[in-house]
From Swiss-Prot:
One of the early assembly proteins it binds 23S rRNA. One of the proteins that surrounds the polypeptide exit tunnel on the outside of the ribosome. Forms the main docking site for trigger factor binding to the ribosome. One of its GO terms (biological process) is translation. It comes from Rhizobium meliloti (strain 1021) (Ensifer meliloti). PANTHER family: 60S RIBOSOMAL PROTEIN L23A (PTHR11620). This is Large ribosomal subunit protein uL23. GO terms for cellular component: ribonucleoprotein complex; ribosome. Belongs to the universal ribosomal protein uL23 family. The lineage of its organism: Bacteria, Pseudomonadati, Pseudomonadota, Alphaproteobacteria, Hyphomicrobiales. InterPro entries: Nucleotide-bd_a/b_plait_sf (IPR012677), Ribosomal_uL23-like (IPR013025), Ribosomal_uL23/eL15/eS24_sf (IPR012678).
Length: 97
């Protein structure tokens, strides 16, 4: 049984053109919680998907400034994790948990 905290760490898979390109290098991209650390992300991916993780790289994409009905606003910042899997391991993010 997986710990419920793992579901709070991994928010959603990031399915973009770049994330599908890095999947060829045995990497998967996830949107993660802002306060999540690399060891927490590694433990969550290994527990939820049953795979071996070799590396975790993180980045914070700053929210864009947008206008809505004449008022200036800002989109939220998003933290992403690029997870490198061990050789022979794979995750199908389209099926979900």
């Amino acid at each position: 049984m997986t710990d419920l905290r793992h579901y709070d760490v991994i928010v959603s898979p990031s399915i973009t053109e770049k994330s599908t390109l890095v999947s060829e290098q045995n990497q998967v991209v996830f949107n993660v919680a802002k306060g999540a650390s690399k060891p927490e992300i590694k433990a969550a991916v290994e527990a939820l998907f049953g795979v071996k993780v070799t590396a975790v790289n993180t980045l914070v994409r700053k929210g864009k400034l947008k206008r809505f009905r004449g008022f200036a606003g800002k989109q939220k910042d998003v933290k992403k994790a690029i997870v490198t899997l061990a050789d022979g391991q794979s995750i199908d993010v389209s099926t979900g948990l």
